[in-house]
């Protein structure tokens, strides 16, 4: 099972049912459960991480705010943004939390490099940046030695809602997206590249693709 990965493409979903399904999957998984990555686009939502502060919500308007249990501060999810949730048994992979964060950042950096986009991580603010502008946000939670939550990569979306918050708690943080810096507009092309990089980085040998929604996710 250590080298087996199931990739689920969930399409467009509300945030909360997928969040609940992640919890269920993590609570019910055993040492024999293969790792999974869920790829999803969310309907518009602001999510507050565990460190989130109300003052970073400037003007949320008609977009709902959900209190999440991932690490980090407030961010925005919406159509045209690739969200990848990493349901990985870290003990089995012999990875620490910091290792996983570094792997995920490198995964995004390598994905962008395939489109000749130079990007970098920052030691003071998790995520991936292009010319100082944030292109990918990151927030994880670990339970029973297993990770859930993951990354949000801006591909081809309306970035306007980010102006209604201090993204990840940083006032004036500028956001950018793949389609603005010479990359593709097609989110599926970016998904494909991301999974290719993940399989290489984390040494998966068997990859199974599925569009079957998780137990909670199909209620969205």
From Swiss-Prot:
Keyword GTP-binding: no
Residues at the catalytic site: 168
SUPFAM superfamilies, per the entry: Class II aaRS and biotin synthetases (SSF55681)
Enzyme class: transferase
Gene Ontology MF term list: lipoyl(octanoyl) transferase activity
Pfam families: LplA-B_cat
Listed EC numbers: 2.3.1.181
Physiological role: Catalyzes the transfer of endogenously produced octanoic acid from octanoyl-acyl-carrier-protein onto the lipoyl domains of lipoate-dependent enzymes. Lipoyl-ACP can also act as a substrate although octanoyl-ACP is likely to be the physiological substrate.
Protein family: Belongs to the LipB family.
Other comments on record: In the reaction, the free carboxyl group of octanoic acid is attached via an amide linkage to the epsilon-amino group of a specific lysine residue of lipoyl domains of lipoate-dependent enzymes.
PANTHER family with a match to the protein in the record: LIPOYLTRANSFERASE 2, MITOCHONDRIAL-RELATED (PTHR10993:SF7), OCTANOYLTRANSFERASE (PTHR10993)
Protein name: Octanoyltransferase
Gene (UniProt): lipB
């Amino acid at each position: 099972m250590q080298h087996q990965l199931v990739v689920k493409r969930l399409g467009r979903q509300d945030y909360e049912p997928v969040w609940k399904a992640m919890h269920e999957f993590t609570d019910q998984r055993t040492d024999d459960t293969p790792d999974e990555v869920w790829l999803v686009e969310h309907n518009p939502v602001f999510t507050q991480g565990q460190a989130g502060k109300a003052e970073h919500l400037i003007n949320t308007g008609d977009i709902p705010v959900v209190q999440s249990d991932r690490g980090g501060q407030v961010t925005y999810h919406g159509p045209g943004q690739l969200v990848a949730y990493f349901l990985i048994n870290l003990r089995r992979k012999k990875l620490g939390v910091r290792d996983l964060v570094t792997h995920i950042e490198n995964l995004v950096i390598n994905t962008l490099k395939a489109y000749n986009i130079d990007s970098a991580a920052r030691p003071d603010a998790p995520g991936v940046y292009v010319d100082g502008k944030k292109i990918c946000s990151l927030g994880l939670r670990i339970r029973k030695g297993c990770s859930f939550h993951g990354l949000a990569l801006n591909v081809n979306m309306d970035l306007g809602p980010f102006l209604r918050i201090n993204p990840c708690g940083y006032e004036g943080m500028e956001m950018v997206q793949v389609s603005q810096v010479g990359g593709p507009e097609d989110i599926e092309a970016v998904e494909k590249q991301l999974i290719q990089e993940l399989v290489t980085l984390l040494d998966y040998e068997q990859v199974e693709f599925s569009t079957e929604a998780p137990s909670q996710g199909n209620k969205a």
